[in-house]
Amino acid sequence: MTRRALVSVSDKTGLVPFARRLAALGVELLSTGGTQKALAEAGVPVTGVGDYTQAPEILGGRVKTLHPRVHGGILYRRGLASDEADVKARDIPPIDLVVVNLYPFREAVAAGKPFETCVEEIDIGGPTMVRSAAKNSAHVGVVVDPADYDKVAAELEATRALSDATRFYLMKKAFAHTAAYDAAISEYLTARETPEAAPAHFPATLAAVYTKAYDLRYGENPHQAGAFYRAAREPEEPSVAFAQVLQGKELSYNNLLDLQAALAGVMEFDETACVVIKHNTPCGVSTGRTAGEAFARARECDPVSAFGGIVALNRPVDEATASELTSLFLECVIAPGYDAAARAALAVKKNLRLLEAPRLGAARATWRRRPEEGRELRSIPGGLLVMDRDLGSVRREDCKVMTKRAPTEQEWKDLLFAWKVVKHVKSNAIVFAKDDRTVAIGGGQTSRVESVKTAVMKAALDVRGSSVGSDAFFPFADGVEEIIKAGATAIIQPGGSMRDAEVIAAADKAGIAMVATGMRHFRH
């Protein structure tokens, strides 16, 4: 039977109705600080913990519930003779229900509060009570989520006690709650730079907090279950995770992956640009005078693959752009915004998933990345691979001309465009570019020469006079020879092959230009 509950919450959602239901059952309510005040003002009978323990709050409220009469009442094992003797000797009544959620530490961090303020929002007594109650879940219920208030109250009203199954459910939730709280603190402190020490690039212990945003219909395939988890803080750069879904069917696992690929690609450009993604790799990229023109030019690179694709634009969508978008079946579109006419035009495509990411319209120079946002995580059974995200880029002055002929001004422009795109194509990656757009893309092949052949074979546009980007060096001259045969006139690649001399000789023989970046962009 539940006779006594300790209630101390920062999130007061649903607090008063829940407390009234407990009080109506004859449950004695103990409380502290703001929670006690809220209950008293609502007319709910409540006893202050200080009165209960005969020990007032001290140290400005830092010590409220850290008392044997509180934790003895929570932790004692009912029916165990030695525990029964201890609590009887010390006059410690049982506490059967603990209702606690913790100081808003994450909210303070997200709001950019000073370090000292954030430290004061680190809860001590709350997690201690939650862990005590969860450890003793055989006898005590612990509620950390207001969403569980109705379930708990209804069960108590029906049986005056919580079932083993309910207490175990609450126990799991409680430990997840405190684990996430501690991980948030660790993550914040790990990333903090001080005059004495910079944050560890890869800390000895990696703590991260993700909360389930929603279940997915399935994972990559229908036989795989899936869910989407969101980080505690929204990044300052554009984010699929925090983008607003304006219309369309629910997002799938594959949609989210493809949207991220599209977003990453379009974020390479300050100019008005569009990226079309299919199966997590670009099938068309272009800049344009308008967003609509950029999409139309990107689509022309591979119109067959663009069907059913994912589109990212870095400028707001107007009615003219919406008209272009509705001319093709698309799964998703993400952009900084949509005007009213565009929304009306796109509404006819009821299944089209429309996402808005306002930060996508801001200048790239304004984006800031916290240390944890510069990392990429991949799980393997029993481990986690962690690396820096591939945010590398090159300028013209970073490149070394490898051939006798240097690129023309137009070739330089096309080469640097191809280099921005090729890092987002699955390796082995080849991109033909001309006039600020891709004209052919080949990727995902197990040999570089086959990626060249694939790009040329699939090309819907004329590749003659184009410039080519390669994500890694050419191990043999055959790939370059195929590029020459296709009519391209310049190549940008990392360089560094044992056979660079052969590769350069093939380029010189054909009179084409080749430059080396010294930077590889493998994408597995």
Curated annotation (Swiss-Prot):
Catalysis: reaction(s):
(6R)-10-formyltetrahydrofolate + 5-amino-1-(5-phospho-beta-D-ribosyl)imidazole-4-carboxamide = 5-formamido-1-(5-phospho-D-ribosyl)imidazole-4-carboxamide + (6S)-5,6,7,8-tetrahydrofolate; IMP + H2O = 5-formamido-1-(5-phospho-D-ribosyl)imidazole-4-carboxamide
Q: Which organism is it from?
A: Anaeromyxobacter dehalogenans (strain 2CP-C)
MGS-like domain location, by residue? 1-144
User: What keywords are assigned to this protein?
Assistant: Hydrolase, Multifunctional enzyme, Purine biosynthesis, Transferase
Task: Please spell out the taxonomic lineage of the organism that makes this protein.
Answer: Bacteria, Pseudomonadati, Myxococcota, Myxococcia, Myxococcales
Family that this chain belongs to: Belongs to the PurH family.
Gene Ontology BP, a term: 'de novo' IMP biosynthetic process
InterPro entries (alphabetical)? AICAR_Tfase_dup_dom_sf, Cytidine_deaminase-like, MGS-like_dom, MGS-like_dom_sf, PurH-like
Drop me one GO molecular function for this one: phosphoribosylaminoimidazolecarboxamide formyltransferase activity
Does the entry feature the keyword rRNA processing, yes or no? Answer: no
Cellular component per GO, a single term: cytosol
The metabolic or biological pathway listed in the UniProt record of this protein is:
Purine metabolism; IMP biosynthesis via de novo pathway; 5-formamido-1-(5-phospho-D-ribosyl)imidazole-4-carboxamide from 5-amino-1-(5-phospho-D-ribosyl)imidazole-4-carboxamide (10-formyl THF route): step 1/1; Purine metabolism; IMP biosynthesis via de novo pathway; IMP from 5-formamido-1-(5-phospho-D-ribosyl)imidazole-4-carboxamide: step 1/1
Domain comment? The IMP cyclohydrolase activity resides in the N-terminal region.
Q: Which SUPFAM superfamilies match?
A: Cytidine deaminase-like (SSF53927), Methylglyoxal synthase-like (SSF52335)
PANTHER family membership = BIFUNCTIONAL PURINE BIOSYNTHESIS PROTEIN ATIC, BIFUNCTIONAL PURINE BIOSYNTHESIS PROTEIN PURH
Show the HAMAP family listed in the entry: PurH
- Enzyme Commission numbers on file: 2.1.2.3, 3.5.4.10
Q: What superkingdom does the record give?
A: Bacteria
UniProt name for this protein: Bifunctional purine biosynthesis protein PurH
Tell me yes or no: is GTP-binding among this UniProt entry's keywords: no
